[in-house]
Amino acid sequence: MAPSFYHYLPVPMDEMGGKQGWGSHRQWLGAAILVVLFGVTLVILTIYFAVTANSVACRDGLRAQAECRNTTHLLQRQLTRTQDSLLQAETQANSCNLTVVTLQESLEKKVSQALEQQARIKELENEVTKLNQELENLRIQKETSSTVQVNSGSSMVVSSLLVLKVSLFLLF
């Protein structure tokens, strides 16, 4: 036969019956009372929280929370629209700034061209004055000269040279 090894000593049957009787029922009774008390406590707490959750103050708080949430969403939408408008305004400002810079550069070019043209006009006016003076000098020489043919030939050459020179200056 196999060896019997038990962690406890064998107890006669008549002793086991006495322990399981009243002591065992007490433990079950204590456990049942604890379970009932726990259940009653849970029911009372549930009723208390249900009453508290349905109270006027709680409903007012929930209503205020919903209003705050709605106001927050409204403000967020307004902020988004404002930021979009600001971005558009900045884009337009940048475009306007580029246009202003381009127009300033164009104006500076036109001013420099106008100054160059004025300088060229002054130069040509001086040249015309000089040529008029030479023409006057040639007329005086003509009057003082004794021969009419020589004077008329030379004045014709000088006149044609002056016309050629003035036309060349005006072209360039």
Swiss-Prot record:
Q: Does the keyword Chaperone apply?
A: no
Positions of transmembrane segments: 31-51
Q: What is this protein called?
A: Bone marrow stromal antigen 2
Topological domain spans for side Extracellular: 52-152
Q: Which domain of life is it from?
A: Eukaryota
Inducers of expression = By viral or other interferon-inducing stimulation in most cell types (at protein level). Down-regulated by ebola virus GP protein.
Topology feature Cytoplasmic, residues: 1-30
Subcellular location(s): the record lists: Golgi apparatus, trans-Golgi network; Cell membrane; Late endosome; Membrane raft
Q: In which tissues is it expressed?
A: In naive mice, specifically expressed on type I interferon-producing cells (at protein level).
Query: How the protein sits in the membrane?
Result: Single-pass type II membrane protein; Lipid-anchor; GPI-anchor
> Looking at the keywords, is Transmembrane helix present?
yes
What organism, scientifically named, is this protein from?
A: Mus musculus
Tell me the function of this protein.
IFN-induced antiviral host restriction factor which efficiently blocks the release of diverse mammalian enveloped viruses by directly tethering nascent virions to the membranes of infected cells. Acts as a direct physical tether, holding virions to the cell membrane and linking virions to each other. The tethered virions can be internalized by endocytosis and subsequently degraded or they can remain on the cell surface. In either case, their spread as cell-free virions is restricted.
Q: What is known of its domains?
A: The extracellular coiled coil domain forms an extended 170 A long semi-flexible rod-like structure important for virion retention at the cell surface and prevention of virus spreading.
User: What assembly does the database describe for this protein?
Assistant: Parallel homodimer; disulfide-linked. May form homotetramers under reducing conditions. Isoform 1 and isoform 2 form homodimers and also heterodimers with each other. Dimerization is essential for its antiviral activity. Interacts (via cytoplasmic domain) with ARHGAP44. Interacts with MMP14 (via C-terminal cytoplasmic tail). Interacts with LILRA4/ILT7. Interacts with RNF115.
Q: Which residues form the propeptide?
A: 153-172
Gene Ontology BP terms: defense response to virus; innate immune response; negative regulation of cell growth; negative regulation of cell migration; negative regulation of intracellular transport of viral material; negative regulation of plasmacytoid dendritic cell cytokine production; negative regulation of viral genome replication; regulation of actin cytoskeleton organization
Lipid attachment points (GPI-anchor amidated serine):
152
Q: Name one Pfam family in it.
A: BST2
